[in-house]
Amino acid sequence: MIQVIPSIAIRKGKVVKMRKGDPGSEKAYGENPIDLAKRFEDHGIKVVHLVDLDGAEAGAPKNYHVLEGIAGYTDLKVDFTGGVCTDGDISKAFECGADYITAASVAVTDPEQFASWIVSYGREKITLSADVSDPVSKTIAFRGWQRKSDKTLYDHLQFFNDRGLKYAKSTDVTRDGVLEGPNFEFYQDILDRFPDLKILASGGVRGVDDILRFQEMGIFAVIFGKAYYEGILNLKDLEQFAEKSAT
């Protein structure tokens, strides 16, 4: 069964969302991130995707305290991402309660470093974030999606697939936060090219039907955010999804 994972994006301690990765479009939601995580847990969620936006842009995590709070006050497994670029960063993230690490920028700027983490921490603990700001050229976006690499998605995935990668998250940034639906063809291409990778889809999810379609495609997990915060995908929807998936 597909995993359904809510995203909690943090800037300066607040829960926020953007449109297409544009900081100028940022909207803050009046949610305490720890209370929010607890609410997800109370409705059957097992894993949350915690995004340190300050860290992603700075190149070093800035919201370890939020990670510690969620890990300390819930039994959720936390997938932490945002600025994890050094051995010290990843070690501290795990010490603060992260169960998994998702990294993007270091895989672009120091691919051998990221590859070493797959070996050191185990492939179950490490996820590559391979996001694109242009679904045609498929060049990798990093540093909080504010910079573009000359690396292409498929070459990037192949490099780490050859080095033992098991999990890859990918976002078509043009669909993120706009509630226009996921780019299903984008993910189907990834699945076709990399059948051994477990793919986490993120960006554009509107509701249960999108999640079910991803499940039918063979996507490992779907990460959602904006649809929940805007009241389009609510906790009742998630319960409905669980019921549908069980039938």
Where in the sequence are the language-model features?
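Non-catalytic positions within long, well-ordered alpha-helices that form the structural scaffold/packing
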Residues: 41-44, 94-95, 161, 215
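Active-site-adjacent loop and "lid" segments of alpha/beta metabolic enzymes
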Residues: 19, 138-148, 178-181, 189, ...
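Structural preference for beta-strand elements that scaffold enzyme active sites
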Residues: 3-7, 47, 75-79, 99-102, ...
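Conserved anion-binding
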Residues: 12-13, 20-24, 94, 98-176
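Active-site-adjacent beta->alpha loops and helix N-cap segments on the catalytic face
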Residues: 3-4, 55-71, 85-91, 105-127, ...
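N-terminal beta-alpha supersecondary unit
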Residues: 15-61
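Short, acidic/polar
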Residues: 29-41, 86-91, 148-159, 211
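Catalytic cores of alpha/beta
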Residues: 74, 78-101, 185-224
